[in-house]
């Protein structure tokens, strides 16, 4: 174990000397996909609860599609499937984008987490007390102002416990990135195992890294919940 750490601690944490690897790469994939997925999911969640079918149904189809298929397959489609289409390779911009493994991986991860986050936020919007909305309307708020100042802030706070689970699941899901040759923590562990044949130690180090990051994320979300969801607790 000590010899393995002495040789591979840098690749496991941040770099192999030439590229970003290991934990740094995993955190980059997680952050990029979560930020994109979060931003896109806000308007999609509003559309998801729309009373207009032509607005609601396309979003519903998208969320069912990406929640109903494995992320591994979604990554393979983005990484190899789309680039195999001649029309994609014929367009310089699309050709450059889908030739890059990082672009394909972030795209697949972002689309996947966006689908789950959209449903989380949509559920929080539906669960809002009707009285809150009526009170806001009584103050003259309507349309986008009603969503911007009342509905979405309340929905985002209430959905925090569920969104924290999605973040943790997304962290664990980044392990499929090695499929696209992305040097994340699992890819470094596989390379270390191939070079040293120390299977238990190689993957054990990877497991410890994921466990530590998970504990940190859980702690941060618990702090956020105590701060932003205090109004839901019992009155003293």
What are these regions (language model features)?
Residues 1-236:
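Transmembrane alpha-helices and adjacent helix-loop boundaries
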